[in-house]
A protein has these predicted regions:
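A short alpha-helix-loop-beta-strand transition element characteristic
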Residues: 1, 71-73, 211-214, 261-271, ...
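Short glycine/proline- and acidic residue-enriched helix-loop micro-motifs
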Residues: 1-14, 361
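Rossmann-like dinucleotide-binding cores of NAD(P)H-dependent redox enzymes
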Residues: 11, 15-21, 25, 91-92, ...
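A Rossmann-like FAD-binding core segment of flavoenzymes
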Residues: 34-37, 41-52, 59, 120-222, ...
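Glycine-rich dinucleotide-binding loop and its adjacent helix/turn
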Residues: 66-122, 126, 151, 155, ...
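FAD-site-proximal beta/loop scaffold in flavoenzymes
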Residues: 81-97, 185-258
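Flexible, glycine-rich terminal cap/loop adjacent to redox cofactors
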Residues: 259, 275-286, 291-395
């Protein structure tokens, strides 16, 4: 039986992180950006005090962009114990547990569950809601659930975690709800992945005159400008979705606006990706959103069972779905479940932003055999001209 070398795995992960952070430091130096490391807080609207390893330093500024991010939400009844971790702690890979509990059936929880189950851990998942990966259309999640039906142990939906106790042999967790076991369950490791809270109340924003909501978010306009005109904010601290690529885009907008350019955040879509196995990705309007907003829509679903590349990969469980405006046939959203779905969703993102219709996508020549051509085939399917499936009625 293959053995997992955690030391080598940690070293590889550390090497990747070091390479990326070193690259950022190099780019900052090339642009003559001074990096001050430490914990910072505003002193007034034009000064920030930073407490670093070598003492305090006051930074004076004419304009500022707040990118203070968020932190993992903690459950008050969870014991302070190294066997209870958040996603950051889980990525440190201190140990390979025999039995692990993931609290939270969202993207982060399921990604970590995928990692640890791949390494050999027995995984239980508990989720308060009636489904996993909420936010994604249920047909996408259903494929993931079927593929992982035997991968995890007990998946407890509509169930709360109500108590926990640290003992020498593990963390004992008590549940309440529809799928809750009667007795407390013992785990070697517990991951708490129940969301993140913004750091708006930790930076002395009030001293700069920046308004912060009760929950710690900072409200901004379309230029990412706060109520103080020369101070901007981006990322998790300005609201959902808390995604790195959204934050980067907001950063571009804020920097350009601070430079005096007419830059605005007006994205028509923000893609979401669950880096699970299989991956689940979606962008633009979901079917659930269309129904809730009363949007008349049509859809086309191309099954990967008809994809030569998916069949050759031995991974044809997925599908590619495009969602169209019923009247104009423009692409307004889409979802993909399957191998490398996160890489494939980019074409859907561009289609939504550019106002492409089914004919635009369907008549774009895609390389064969690839998973990417499933996007083109879904568009052809909607137009009734796909030759890789039985005849369809032309729209």
């Amino acid at each position: 039986k293959p053995q997992v070398d955690l030391d080598k795995l940690r070293d590889f992960k550390g090497g990747v992180v070091k390479k990326l952070t070193t690259g950022l430091a190099g780019m900052a130096k090339a642009r003559k950006v001074e990096v001050v490391t430490g914990i910072g807080a505003f002193v007034d609207p034009f000064h920030m005090e930073v407490q670093g390893d070598n003492g305090k330093k006051v930074v004076k500024f004419k304009q500022a962009i707040i990118a203070a991010g968020s932190q993992a939400v903690k459950l008050p009844f969870m014991p302070e114990d190294p066997r209870v971790v958040d996603s950051t702690g889980a990525l440190e890979l201190r140990q390979l547990p025999k039995r692990m509990l993931v609290i939270g059936g969202g993207i982060i929880g399921l990604e970590m569950a995928t990692v640890y189950s791949t390494l050999g851990a027995e995984i239980d998942v508990v989720e308060m809601m009636d489904g996993l990966m909420m936010g994604a259309d249920r047909d996408l999640v259903k494929v993931w659930e079927k593929f992982n039906a035997k991968r995890f142990g007990n998946v407890m939906l509509k169930t709360k975690t109500v108590g926990a106790q640290a003992k020498e042999d593990g963390i004992y967790v008590k549940f309440e709800g529809e799928k809750a076991p009667a007795e407390a369950q013992r785990y070697d490791l517990v991951l708490v992945a129940v969301g993140r809270s913004p750091n708006g109340k930790k930076i002395g924003a009030d001293k700069a005159g920046v308004a912060v909501t009760e929950r710690g978010f900072i409200d901004v306009d379309k230029q990412m400008r706060t109520n103080v005109p020369h101070i901007f904010a981006i990322g998790d601290i300005v609201g959902q979705p808390m995604l790195a690529h959204k934050a980067v885009h907001e950063g571009h907008v804020a920097a350009e606006a601070a430079h005096g350019e007419k830059a605005y955040f007006d994205a028509l879509q923000i893609p979401s990706v669950a880096y699970t196995d299989p991956e689940v990705a979606w962008a633009g309007k979901t079917e659930d959103q269309c129904k809730a907003e009363g949007i008349k829509y049509g859809k086309a679903v191309f099954p990967w069972a008809a994809s030569g590349r998916a069949i050759a990969n031995g991974r044809d469980e997925g599908f590619t779905k495009l969602i169209f405006d019923e009247e104009t046939h423009r692409v307004i959203g889409g979802g993909i479940v399957g191998l490398n779905a996160g890489d494939l969703i980019s074409e859907v993102c561009l289609a939504v932003e550019m106002g492409a219709d089914a004919e635009d996508i369907g008549k774009t020549i895609h390389p064969h055999p690839t998973l990417g051509e499933s996007v083109g085939m879904a568009a052809e399917l909607y137009e009734g001209v796909c030759t890789d499936l039985p005849p369809q009625r032309k729209k």
